[in-house]
């Protein structure tokens, strides 16, 4: 899951520039995603997640770290991309519900990356998903994701990368 946890933070670091929705509005008159979702942030986040995943693959082999999941280039790419696609889907829904950029949305803010990652990997690499994500790992993901999300966002807020600490 590490390749899925990295992209959101990296997107905040690399963000800025052209919004993915190019400033367009949806049929409800609201922005599709908003200014917070940019091409630079999206691709910077995905590349960062993939690079961390490749380091994980190398470390697992080089240091015989059997506790790490058996990752592949495909799995780390799907996890990283799915995390940010989940974030985009959440932003789309937030705009439809009239929520502002940065406004907290309990549970959706914490689990969008998990849902996006798992959905993408379920579609393109279900063998990896069912062979790697056991019940104890799934429980760990459900419990730890909101905690990690909160800690990382607080750090991002204090170093000036995020406008709000959630």
UniProtKB/Swiss-Prot annotation:
Its main location: membrane. Pfam families: CarS-like (PF01864). GO terms for biological process: glycerophospholipid biosynthetic process. GO terms for molecular function: CDP-2,3-bis-(O-geranylgeranyl)-sn-glycerol synthase activity. InterPro entries: CarS (IPR032690), CarS_archaea (IPR002726). It is a multi-pass membrane protein. It is found in: Cell membrane. This is CDP-archaeol synthase. It comes from Methanoculleus marisnigri (strain ATCC 35101 / DSM 1498 / JR1).
């Amino acid at each position: 899951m590490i390749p899925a946890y990295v992209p959101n933070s990296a997107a905040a670091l690399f963000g800025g520039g052209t919004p993915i929705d190019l400033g367009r509005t949806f049929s409800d008159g609201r922005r599709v995603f908003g200014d917070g979702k940019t091409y630079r942030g999206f691709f910077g986040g995905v590349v960062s997640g993939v690079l961390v995943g490749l380091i994980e693959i190398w470390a697992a082999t080089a240091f015989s770290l059997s506790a790490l999941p058996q990752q592949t280039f495909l799995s780390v790419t799907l996890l990283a991309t799915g995390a940010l696609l989940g974030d985009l889907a959440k932003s789309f829904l937030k705009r439809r519900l009239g929520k502002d950029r940065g406004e907290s949305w309990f549970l959706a803010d914490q689990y969008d990356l998990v849902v996006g990652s798992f959905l993408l990997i379920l579609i393109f690499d279900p063998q990896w998903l069912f062979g790697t994500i056991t019940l104890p790992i799934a429980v760990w993901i459900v419990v730890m994701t909101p905690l990690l999300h909160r800690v990382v966002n607080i750090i991002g807020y204090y170093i000036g990368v995020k406008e709000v600490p959630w």
